[in-house]
């Protein structure tokens, strides 16, 4: 099972478009939308299948929503993929198939399409550049995260990915690098 985690910090129409991109996939998923109480009230989430709304107390800032997901949803053997609310899933996400990886694999690094149509990939486990990796470029086993959380800073996703890489490598676990485009980076804000 893949848990897709989206923190809603923008308008609900971003969630509608994100849902359409998820619904087009052929994967076993549960979608968690983490948001504040006021934004939760504006969502018509009855139309979203396999979706759980998590209301986070306080404000939504940087990566606090993802951290809140990790605080309230325990390890159930799931893979976690963070879909920023301005990103959209790519149909090739179907090719990732995390259930086919060895139980020793704790992280899968994937590609992401940018507005320029360029594909952003990571070219090695030691080349996870903090300033160049986005949430949409990796999946992680929930158990591998443990107490680790995102830092509430710009590029926090890069630091998080780097820390997961270090923990995984140092514990003798595996990281897979898959040349598959999993999402569109900031797709909902592209100029048409």
Language-model region placement:
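Short, acidic, metal-binding catalytic loop of nucleotide-sugar glycosyltransferases
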Residues: 20-29
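Glycine-rich, basic loop-to-helix element that forms the pyrophosphate-binding segment
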Residues: 56-73
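Short beta-strand-to-loop acidic/aromatic patch adjacent to the donor-nucleotide binding site
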Residues: 77-88
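Conserved donor NDP-sugar-binding/catalytic core segment of glycosyltransferases
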Residues: 95-122
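N-proximal low-complexity "stem/linker" segments adjacent to membrane-targeting elements
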Residues: 1-21
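Conserved nucleotide-sugar donor-binding catalytic segment
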Residues: 126-192
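Acidic helix N-cap motif at the loop->helix transition within catalytic regions
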Residues: 39-47
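Short beta-strand/loop segment that forms part of the nucleotide-sugar
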Residues: 28-39, 54-56
């Amino acid at each position: 099972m893949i848990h897709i985690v989206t923190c809603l910090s923008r308008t609900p129409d971003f969630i509608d478009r994100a849902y359409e991109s998820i619904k087009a996939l052929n994967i076993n998923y549960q979608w968690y939308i983490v948001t504040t109480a006021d934004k939760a009230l504006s969502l018509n989430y009855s139309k979203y299948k396999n979706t759980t709304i998590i209301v986070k107390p306080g404000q939504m800032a940087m990566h606090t929503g993802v951290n809140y997901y990790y605080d309230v949803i325990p390890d159930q053997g799931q893979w976690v993929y963070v879909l920023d609310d301005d990103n959209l899933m790519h149909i090739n996400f179907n090719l990732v198939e995390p259930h086919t990886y060895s139980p020793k694999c704790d992280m899968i690094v994937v590609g992401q399409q940018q507005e320029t149509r360029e594909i952003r990939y990571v070219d090695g486990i030691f080349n996870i550049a903090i300033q160049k990796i986005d949430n949409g470029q990796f999946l992680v086993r929930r158990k591998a995260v443990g107490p680790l959380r995102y830092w509430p800073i710009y590029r926090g996703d890069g630091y998080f990915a780097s820390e997961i890489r270090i923990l995984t490598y140092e514990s003798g676990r595996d990281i897979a690098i898959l040349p598959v485009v999993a999402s569109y980076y900031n797709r909902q804000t592209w100029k048409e």
